[in-house]
Swiss-Prot record:
UniProt-listed CDD domains: CYP19A1 (cd20616)
GO cellular component annotations of the record: endoplasmic reticulum; membrane
Topological relation to the membrane, as annotated: Peripheral membrane protein
Gene Ontology biological process terms, A to Z: female gonad development; response to estradiol
Record-given protein name: Ovarian aromatase
InterPro entries named in the record: Cyt_P450 (IPR001128), Cyt_P450_CS (IPR017972), Cyt_P450_E_grp-I (IPR002401), Cyt_P450_sf (IPR036396), Cytochrome_P450_Monoox (IPR050196)
GO terms of molecular function: aromatase activity; heme binding; iron ion binding
Organism for this UniProt entry: Carassius auratus (Goldfish)
SUPFAM superfamilies: Cytochrome P450
Gene3D superfamilies: Cytochrome P450 (1.10.630.10)
Amino acid sequence: MAGELLQPCGMKQVHLGEAVLELLMQGAHNSSYGAQDNVCGAMATLLLLLLCLLLAIRHHWTEKDHVPGPCFLLGLGPLLSYCRFIWSGIGTASNYYNSKYGDIVRVWINGEETLILSRSSAVYHVLRKSLYTSRFGSKLGLQCIGMHEQGIIFNSNVALWKKVRSFYAKALTGPGLQRTLEICITSTNTHLDNLSHLMDARGQVDILNLLRCIVVDISNRLFLGVPLNEHDLLQKIHKYFDTWQTVLIKPDVYFRLAWWLHRKHKRDAQELQDAIAALIEQKRVQLTRAEKFDQLDFTAELIFAQSHGELSTENVRQCVLEMIIAAPDTLSISLFFMLLLLKQNPDVELKILQEMNAVLAGRSLQHSHLSGFHILESFINESLRFHPVVDFTMRRALDDDVIEGYKVKRGTNIILNVGRMHRSEFFPKPNEFSLDNFQKNVPSRFFQPFGSGPRSCVGKHMAMVMMKSILVTLLSRFSVCPVKGCTVDSIPQTNDLSQQPVEEPSSLSVQLILRNAL
């Protein structure tokens, strides 16, 4: 009966053992395919993760988060880079790192991230932005020399810096600038007429000391206007400057542990501060006794601002101090290097003398003549490019920024290595002293001897007038003959806060020979 019932359905009879075996075989076959699928899926996932990692690394380097420079190495890198700055000086260390790592480098000074820039576009970016109007330096060091939130040079209180800068701008432009030429000529001639007290037994003159005396006298006549002892004041300025570059980036522990050195530095700085305070008091008495004020100079303007409560006594003193010291240790040394370069390049000296004769034509030097000294101006610019006294400037970022694709965080220190930037391939002969480098107009982004932007040197126009007038007056009367073999490259120099000659008589003494005696 069962057979009858099943027959219409067309079903076959199958043994149970065969059915089970077939099922197991099919399961085993499906399992092998599943294992292969799992392996392929895992490999695909790993490849995808690797691709994502490579893309992340590429993005990281494309965004330039990693600035070239020494490695961190658990804090050893920051320590070693800071020691190099302390040991060799800021200028020398900056040149070392730019030479080793390129034109944008990250180092550390006192544990703070610091960028050293010598690429012209990066330097120009920083100079022109108000984001970088602050400077960096040791707070205790700046307090030691009276520059912390006072004066103009290292004052990082931007609001107060802007206020005092207006006094400098007024003194260094307008009527003050118009008086500069006459005062420079008078002062230079006066000192050249009285060379005997600067001559040694061989009849040679300490030319750097002569230039410093001329420049400090000019500064006094322009900005202070009281009797002073030039040599005594210059000695105090020299000690103040040494203290300045010694304490500028020292760590706080230096001032606490090396208290005897701190006391010495404070005493050296205080000597000049007291001398300036005494000169300001002389000026105050002079103003009190004056029946009328024909023209107020820089110090008089500051004294009146103090009397109206606009400035503190300490800030007035620091402003006058910085105005008086600025030229003797920058402009006078620049002139010293220029005189050496002239003797190294007699063809350039001859061209300048011929230009002087053509422009002056036997007449006294006047303002109208200055624009005619094209060769002289090219010589001054090339000297400032080839061997600058101040070859870097220090800034601090007031907010986050991006420089050449690199992220810069707020508070990052910036060193603009302008001296190295001036050796760029833009100039026809970047590593040579040649007037060909200024045969054509040079865009400001490639040549920044006085900086640019909101914190540029406020006295750059007056500095050019002073250099031209002093050089023309000196060269029209004397030929400057250094000791044989004395060149810009051969004399010992330091490069910390600025490039300065080591003051040895053998390298600073020159023979001044009258032109009409040649």
